[in-house]
Amino acid sequence: MSSTRHSYSSGGSGKSKHGRRIAQTSADAKLYAAYEESSESGSFDYSQSVSAGKEGISSQLVTAYLQRMQRGGLVQQFGCLIAVEEETFRVLAYGANAPEMLDVATQAVPTMGQYSRLCIGADVRTLLSPASASALDRVIGVVDVSMFNPITVQSRSSGKPFYAILHRNDVGLVIDLEPIRPDDASITGGALQSHKLAAKAIARLQSLPGGDIGLLCDSVVEEVHELTGFDRVMAYKFHEDEHGEVVAEIRRTDLEPYIGLHYPATDIPQAARFLFMKNRVRMICDCRLPPVKLIQDKTLSQPMSLTGSKLRAPHGCHTQYMANMNSISSLVMAVIVNDSDDDSPGHSSQGIKLWGLVVCHHTSPRYVPFPVRSACEFLMQVFSLQLNMEVGMAAQVREKHILRTQTLLCDMLLRDAPIGIVSQSPNIMDLVTCDGAALYYGKKCWLLGTTPTEAQIVDIAAWLLDCHKDSTGLSTDSLAKTGYPEASCLGDAVCGLAAAKITATDFLFWFRSHTAKEVRWGGARHDPEERDDGRRMHPRSSFKAFLEVVKQQSLPWEDVEMDAIHSLQLILRGSFQDIDDSNTKTMIHARLNDLKLQGLDELSTVASEMVRLIETATAPILAVDGQGLINGWNGKVAELTGLSFETAMGKSLAKELVHEESKTIVERVLHLALEGEEEQDIEIHLRTYDQHKQKGVVILIVNTCCSRDVSNNVVGVCFVGQDVTGQKLVLDRFIRIQGDYKAIVQSLNPLIPPIFGADEYGFCSEWNAAMEKLSNWRREEVLGKMLVGEIFGLQMVCCRLQGQDVVTKLMIVLNDAVNGQESEKFPLVFYDRNGRRVEALLIASKRTDADGRITGVFCFLHTASPELLQALIIKRAKEKVDKELSYVKEELKKPLEGLAFTRTVLEGTNLTIEQRQLIKTNAWCERQLRKILEDDLNNIEEGYMDLEMSEFFMGSVIDAVISQGMAASRGKGVQILTEIPNDVKLMCLFGDQARLQQVLADLLFCAINHATTTNEDEKDWVTIKVSRTKTRLDDGVHLMHFEFRISHSGQGISEALVEEMTNKSQKWTPEGLAISISCTLIRLMNGDVKYTTDAGNKCFLVTIQFPLAHRDDATSVR
């Protein structure tokens, strides 16, 4: 599809995104040039400059702008900068305030041998104490010097302490020196020590429930506020079109709220965003203080790059912006996430992008010590990890929705109903986010939502055929800017358009309205009458500038949306070409049958392959039948135990093969598994044999898996395990010798697992023989190196990790251990000295001295089989789902209480009979919901459930069931009919009313969802029919036998859903799971449910019996 792109529109490809950034950089340079050219700040008109950003600008001005941003030659006053030649520490540049801050004098030309003064060419180590000089020597040759930051140094002349923050640039090593103040937290050095300050904040972020990016953003601004103490902390997100929005905020109560504000892309220039990617935390202590000039060696060919410096001075344009906001100091942290659509030249794999910023403002000067800033930076890395997961999950949900909608739309086409994609539900509006959609086919229009008139759609189609005749469609966020001549007639209701050509003259259209309706001025009311100085760079002015920029423009079409439209277009073009072919349907069904036969062959092949995989798996796998006798014994478990497959077959696992101490555990696990309850992380001890004689023991951690027959009955148990014999023996010996670990760590025993350790500053202190063998790095080569940064890292390290996310996760594990928290098994993947991929599970534990003080961390590795890793992933996923479900259940109880209170109040008012009946129906629906919230799904599936028996009228049940289906039926245009005798409604019965309601409501919903006819002249319908017979028991009780027939129009539910209903499926859809549970509930109430045909129509047939609430002698049966 062709695509028209403008400022503030979504790129349809990587190239358009890259081009948009280049264009935005030009707009930034234009704004910068306008500011520089103004003789005084009052002559700078901000809002006019934003508009003027659309005009062209020379490449020389853009280059000058970028040069000024990165090589401005100015630094802030809260520290001093010294740049040196790395090998010799010869000074190449320094800030004009450095001599005073270091308490040394300057000397233009040093005398022979005298370098105790600061000047170009001096050895910077002569200005520092001997210990400080040694600390600087330590970093020479280290690839990632940031892991050593901050290094604590002292001035030789005065003893004044400083944090030295190091980075490299194009000329050498840059040292930012920040004075350590008396009230600063005591941090002696290294990133690991700084990260401890964020331990509580990190724990909170990791404990948050998934699926709520808003809560995540709210939490991170609260934690940063607590760490830094700034008056205002905001989370600022960049949208696809480069403009920004404040999505979370915490502030001092007397400050104006900025939550919900949108800002033009020029407010945070592209050059500044690039700098944030390189230097992820930026502090401005006092925007009113003049910057300090940088003095540099005249032999340097250009001004020195300050991209990575913590002291780089802000541009005057930005300081004025801050002053206008009454923000004297600021702290800004970059939030960087993965970017699968990274389009930068030379990027072939997944890149990274700037998702947004966490911005702190203060109304007075404020300094935040570097260790706290480092902790904040680490917190941002954890925040980015969480964001990656949330964005990924949201994308998956969205893609699944699109695929499901596409499938349903294609299903309509297979049933020869092409017009159904606009006349039925779901329809084409459900495919992507839009305000309206239309099908233009055969010179007729079908309209959905907010659209142009039929005449206007015909005109748009003609314009496309005339002006874009060579393309298969068009997408734009502004019809006016695309050149459509009648765009002004459409108004704000229709601004954006995505069009897909499906035949030579026919189109599908999706429409979007004006962006401004999506933009809200949050917090304080934005009064249109309130006028501020539009020429000043103030948030309100910025907001007005944004509204002007997005005039006659919609939200951009995202790449995933255009992919979905294009996919549907390809399907429809083929379908519409074949629409008159009478053999099309026959051909389709024949192809489907071929696919089914092919699927059976593939299933057989997969089954054979699974058997082979189990036999050759690197994990020990064994299986038993219903009597606990071995019927599966793979090669790995035979190797570990010394017992061959033939010898093990038929032996009793509990009585003959496990060690005596594991016998009770195995018997219990077998009993539970045969009852259908699977266990995880069970430790069992198997006997080992040497030529069939018992020799020793092998320790396995196993997960059990029930083996079932075609009827879903448990017929055996499979054990998938991991050999932890070596690790277990090591841990036991650690306990026995109470800390005398050297004999174990440095042992050559092959049973000892790989072990490495670090001191409290993050330097490697242990690297045992097994770790040498695993990594191919000798102990003496790694001891004393920084564990993360020199040994494990991304570039020029001993053991390369896969991406920044893995580095961050490893740092989290080590940080938890140093803070005394035991870590779970962390899947660690790295590449050894020879480039071989190593997969292992890491357990990190604190290391303490004799007084119990934490002195470092110990890490145990054991190589993990794919089977165990998969089991661990599945377990964590299940735990996460269970946690989220518990949260939802708990949160639903509160609004339920509110509904109950409202109902109670209404019951005490003067109501008509009909109104009272509605209140009663509401009460029973509420009771049903409470029952569902209290359900334990596992208990229901296993047949354990307490029924709440009480008297009820069948009429109340019918009313409650129909009320639950009315909204869905009206939305889908389905008519609900009933055939229920009046005497049935008046029957007073004894049973569980809420459960009966739940079952019938689920079946009714399913019937409504599938009540679709292919004949447009027929109305879709669902019929509820109830019949009964009566039996008298010996004790005078009458038993009523009921048949509920819920029939519906259409071809019926799918075979897959029928399989889910009868528990024959291995995977459940939400609808299938609900129906399956309802069938289980009916059987637990001694009833039955079938899906059958009644008088030519598909229907659910429910048979169940209830006693009448009164005997013949009028005595209650309760």
From Swiss-Prot:
Biased composition (Low complexity): 1-10
Chain positions covered by the region annotation Disordered: 1-23
A GO MF term: photoreceptor activity
Domain GAF: 212-391
Domain of life of the source: Eukaryota
Domain spans labelled PAS: 606-677, 740-811
Histidine kinase domain ranges (all copies): 887-1110
Residue sites binding phytochromobilin per the record: C317
SMART domains: GAF (SM00065), HATPase_c (SM00387), PAS (SM00091)
UniProt cross-references to InterPro entries, sorted A to Z: GAF (IPR003018), GAF-like_dom_sf (IPR029016), HATPase_C_sf (IPR036890), His_kinase_dom (IPR005467), PAS (IPR000014), PAS-like_dom_sf (IPR035965), PAS_2 (IPR013654), PAS_fold (IPR013767)
Any single biological process term in GO: detection of visible light
Annotated family: Belongs to the phytochrome family.
NCBIfam families (alphabetical): sensory_box
Protein name (database record): Phytochrome 1
Upper lineage: Eukaryota, Viridiplantae, Streptophyta, Embryophyta, Tracheophyta
Protein encoded by which gene: PHY1
